[in-house]
């Protein structure tokens, strides 16, 4: 490991992160941070840097189509700053080794980690091609984010998705299926024994969703989880409602497809006339085999493996992927977001060391 070069690149990456924090980049409004990242790669001598919308990616020097390709991907968009911030969310203040600012942790630190790794290995003779893509619209799962460039990339063997995981490696990640459901009844006067109360029918369905256990359980992600997150019915106190709508958040493991989960719910929900409509099948569960050579090496070197209940851009990738990066997901979307500079430095060094050994197998 060239520690002098790595320190230089890490220091420069931290300065880029400070500039990213200074530059608002809420989802769909990342044009200025995309420009910063594009110019940063160009300024470091990267020949092939590309941009589509607010997505920026760079390709290995001397790209060889006969070699497999690894994708490094993270995002540069942020959520809106929480109203409870006590600091300026766009001021990259450093105090006692702590860097504050919106996007510092999610996913600035992880993005800098992957950019620095790409630059460290740039121009070296490796058994793999590398592509680094720092993309937009991750926070809102937007169509103009990473999914808009997947067809512009060469075949990918596996992807490393940068998110704050305390440098642990997520080998599996739950997908999301949102269901809009409507229970049907019959209107009537509340004072009489007429009508069919759609709320009561919905309660039967909701209780079933709450208690149903899917047959297959994942060793990394546990069970499929259904959570009712919204209910709406009725407008007048004396009228039995003929409809009750409810919204369901379903977290899916790699053991099921979206269609399989939808079919099971439709076939087993107590009221067969209840409409169950999926919003999208886009955000799939993701997984990389724990016997994959990279995962086996990481585990042997002491990296902790885990299954993640939250989603990332892995959900739209059609190939094996893992999630890792400096920072802590518990800080994401919180007021006074921060990352430790030591987390970035140690994360970069650990990642470079891991890939050096992987490339040298």
Name every feature range the model reports, one short phrase each:
Residues 8, 171, 180-361:
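Metal-dependent amide/peptide-bond hydrolase catalytic core
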Residues 49, 99-107, 305-312:
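Active-site nucleophile and cofactor-binding loops and adjacent substrate-binding regions
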Residues 49, 92-94, 228-231:
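A structural signal for short hydrophobic beta-strand segments in well-ordered beta-sheet cores
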Residues 70-72, 133, 158-160, 322-324:
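Hydrophobic/aromatic beta-strand patches that form the interior of the parallel beta-sheet core
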Residues 108-178, 182, 218:
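Acidic/histidine-rich catalytic neighborhood of metal-dependent amide-processing enzymes
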